[in-house]
Amino acid sequence: MTGGRIYTHSLEKLMPGFAEEAPLERKVTKERVALMTETGVVNIEYASGKPDDANSASYTILRSKFDKWFAEKCEEVGVMMVPGIRVDSLLMDGDKVVGIDAAGEEMYADVVILADGVNSLLAQSIGLKPELKPEQVAVGCKEVIQLGEDVINQRFGVENGEGVSMLVAGDPTVGNIGGGFLYTNKDSVSIGIVATCSDIGRVDVSIPDMLERFKNHPAIEPLIKGGVPLEYSAHLVPEGGFDMIPKLYADGVLVTGDAAAFVINLGYTVRGMDFAVESGKLAAETVIRAKAAEDFSAASLSYYQKLFENSFIYADMKQYRNFPKLLERHEIFNDVPEIADVLFDRLFRVDGTKPVSLPMFAIDEIAKRTSAKKLLDLVMVALDAL
């Protein structure tokens, strides 16, 4: 499962021109970030109008279509795909991983690459990563709603092939840490909620109910009205950032993608698939090198760590390593949307009453909701995150 957007630069380097044949939905041409209260929304939209090159484009996708195409491409170059098998445990020879056990069937390999998601029980079983903490992960809940291509074009103000990405903080999660998202596909939309596990139970609203709340918001309901639900899914998402990255290698094993916590959430964008593609490529390069030397020890596979530390994954995640601390602040999901709502309401309201000084009005509203010390602390955390 994915929210529905892939930044294509890493896949473009691996498969130049792939976008010409891959089952991509729409190219993202409009970025929307919104602060939402129960009845209002403050929305920022950006559309550059500049042509994207292949390395800077991003697209919405549906994994059911995209993964099938991608698997077929892998098979074309000799990969044997074995879907539908649950790996129960790793086969060990002392401290060395030598294969997998799948429902009693043993499969041996020189190297096992773990890509089993953020809750990688396999990586935990050999001590590469600790058990997850609730504040390190979020639950993503998504629905795909059929609308029709022309309806999407009209409602979102786009042409055929053009798409919208929308990320929302505030009311969708009832002030919990997390947010809502909406991506336009060719003839459907992907809409969902992400809520940090440590906040579940903080309010008496379940994750599915949060999604319904989001869908019924006055700013969202007109966009999806009359749609037909096609699918429903849920997924655990890493939220801990750079400091959550585990040890990435051991004798006979490497860790990639979500299992390695290779995801960053910046509020205005969420990235994971481009990291997953790149980490898979780096793992493959490491195995090829190890095979040439017939050395699959931890010392040999540590080359993966070196490649990782010289990659854009490492650079991006290190740059924003303090962002999770900012997104742990409930003020962002409670006070900030409420303050933005009342400020913009005051800014645009014309009712014949005595005008007010907007700066003083803003100070007043902020003072009602938080102390100067807490506000200053939030500003300092934000500066540190950036």
Question: Where are the regions that the model predicts?
Answer:
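N-terminal FAD cofactor-binding segment of flavoenzymes
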Residues: 1-40, 311, 315, 319
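FAD/FMN-dependent oxidoreductases across multiple families
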Residues: 170-177, 186, 199-279, 295-306, ...
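C-terminal auxiliary extensions adjacent to catalytic cores
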Residues: 327-386
